Regions:
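Beta-propeller domains with acidic blade repeats across secreted/periplasmic ectodomains
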Residues: 1-203
């Protein structure tokens, strides 16, 4: 989400307080060791590791004519989103004025970890192909379900200390897939929203 993080670690009382930010938290299986791994994300839908343990997500835009972001998540990183950006007008909005939603540019703030690219329209399901069951064509691909009723496959290559998006093709069209995952058999499964209109106030 992106409404904020506020938690106190039980073992030592350390407080993690990041109001108005989405983030990635890390915790041990027994509930200990809570920490905020990365922050400043705008409602990321799912996280995915590649085969080397690099972590990625696709988060949402601010509905200002900006674009969704394909993000490489680094420990300690800040991707720039604050919930109050969404409630400010265009003529005084840090999100737009400082280009926090765009890939790396020289005049962006130094604290920002810029996205790899601007990509997708309403990201939903996101997963990385962990094996070979889908054939050679789809090895080392991320799969992303869009709210525009299409699912695409994308690839990345290292680019300095980050990555660049190097390929994309459509693998499915016409189904409103909102979640995807790989099963133990190596197949890719999706959950379909069908044709129910999206309503943020739906019970």
């Amino acid at each position: 989400g992106d409404k904020g993080i506020s938690a106190t670690r039980k073992e030592d009382g350390k407080r993690f307080h990041f109001p108005g930010e989405g983030g990635v938290m890390r915790i041990e299986a027994d509930g200990s060791g809570f920490e905020v791994f990365a922050r400043g994300l705008r409602n990321p839908q799912e996280l995915a590791f590649d085969e080397y343990g690099n972590l990625f997500t696709v988060d949402n835009d601010g509905d200002f004519g900006d674009r969704e972001r394909f993000v490489f998540i680094v420990e300690g990183s800040d991707s720039g989103w604050r919930a109050n950006h969404q409630y400010r007008k265009r003529d005084h909005n840090q999100w737009l004025a400082e280009k926090l939603w765009k890939p790396a540019e020289e005049d962006q703030p130094a604290f920002l970890l810029p996205p790899i690219s601007n990509y997708s329209a309403g990201p939903a399901g996101f997963a990385y192909n962990p094996g070979t069951a889908l054939g050679e064509r789809h090895r080392k691909h991320f799969f992303l379900a869009h709210s525009t009723k299409q699912t695409t496959a994308i690839t990345t290559d290292p680019d300095g200390a980050s990555f660049k998006m190097t390929g994309e093709h459509q693998v499915l069209k016409g189904l409103f897939v909102i979640g995807i995952n790989f099963g133990p058999d190596g197949a890719l499964y999706g959950a379909d929203w069908v044709n129910i209109p999206w309503d943020p106030h739906m019970n």
